[in-house]
Amino acid sequence: MIKEYRTINEVVGPLMIVEKVAGVKYEELIEVRMQNGEIRQGQVLEINGDKAMVQIFEGTSNINIRDSKVRFLGHPLELGVSPDMMGRVFDGLGRLKDNGPELLPEKKLDINGEVINPVARDYPDEFIQTGISAIDHLNTLVRGQKLPVFSASGLPHKELAAQIARQANVLNSEEEFAVVFAAIGITFEEAEYFMEDFRQTGAIDRSVLFMNLANDPAIERIATPRMALTAAEYLAYEKGMHVLVIMTDMTNYCEALREISAARREVPGRRGYPGYLYTNLATLYERAGRIRGSKGSVTQIPILTMPEEDKTHPIPDLTGYITEGQIILSRELYKSGIQPPIDVLPSLSRLKDKGTGEGKTRGDHAATMNQLFSAYAQGKQAKELAVILGESALSDVDKIYAAFAQRFEEEYVNQGFDTNRSIEETLDLGWELLSMLPRTELKRIKEDMLDQYLTEGK
């Protein structure tokens, strides 16, 4: 039931206090009708007795308390969903912004989603190919997983996000795959880059885009990832598709949370972020997964920039607790011209062993992954030793490992943002690099596998 009030008591920043309300619900959608006919939308943030605190999406500037009316609409923020969403571009509140025809929704869904019973969850165990060797082979992405990318200011996470959105796929061609892309608090130039890339490569045909710009209100940034995840859940659980949700930049989302928390005069937690930051992030990340009896799945790649490149900052720290690993971008590799600059040693996919092996990727996947990790770590150590003591101090085997590490970065990790490698190409490249090492050094691979795959004469 719609209720209308003229009892606005106070306006503070983006917040408004409405008095003498009854039957109002948390997160209920509201409309503010101004004297000049303008209508602004908002959402109930807090209820205390007969007072409601609401946040206005478009801001509170020029709102006259005496002449404005507030309507409580009786339902939370919703997204109209339909199979026709594919190929369309929405703003952060789910309104079309691509100048295309209006969308006729099949239904409207609450953007906060429904709680998934843990018992109903199915274990993630199917491979998703991104076409990026450092991810597919060494930090494998599995359907239903949440695998964040930890970047820093100035690093090419924008290009990496576009590459994953463009190239990601499932190996079974009979299964439908879709990408839901949520851009949170990005600049106009970044939005243009993503739109242009999606359109030029044709990736937009299998994608749903939500674009929230830096000059949009903070409350819209809070809604954007929820809009994207609602669209993803609809496509996955009602249309049977495997959906990859890419959200960039989650740091902007957390900054918006901090801004709203400060406006509400809440007691701040670590570095000024609200004490419920962990819980709030969990309401997003835990919407990834698979459900028993459902054909589809929701996989997440949240991308965030670490403030001051600090892994202990609350945003990457709490994200790491909730998610199943992390892909870390390295400034050192970026300066060396390695693209994408994925630092494979501190990166981790906790579910990688569940999505690899015969019938999923290839039988030699796990063994070559372990051997490459080991050899690269030894090669890095040898290179560091050479810097301190000089190359002459290295043994012959150490020199081979140092050369291996160099080639590994330049040929394996460095593939550019336009190269789409199949998992077979990646595994074959891994064997080519391992053939540099003496056979006696390949201790993590079984003899029969060495006989089958190792290049002759090496």
Swiss-Prot record:
Q: What superkingdom does the record give? A: Bacteria
GO BP: any one term: proton motive force-driven plasma membrane ATP synthesis
One Pfam family recorded for the sequence: ATP-synt_VA_C
Q: Which family does it belong to?
A: Belongs to the ATPase alpha/beta chains family.
Does Transport show up as a keyword for this record? yes
Q: State which residue ranges cross the membrane.
A: none
Q: Which PROSITE patterns match?
A: ATPASE_ALPHA_BETA (PS00152)
> What's the stated role of this polypeptide?
Produces ATP from ADP in the presence of a proton gradient across the membrane. The V-type beta chain is a regulatory subunit.
Among Gene3D superfamilies, the record links this protein to:
3.40.50.12240
Record-linked SUPFAM superfamilies: C-terminal domain of alpha and beta subunits of F1 ATP synthase, P-loop containing nucleoside triphosphate hydrolases
What is this protein's record name? V-type ATP synthase beta chain
What GO terms are given for molecular function? Answer: ATP binding; proton-transporting ATP synthase activity, rotational mechanism
* Isomerase is among the record's keywords: no
Ordered alphabetically, the record's keywords are:
ATP synthesis, Hydrogen ion transport, Ion transport, Transport
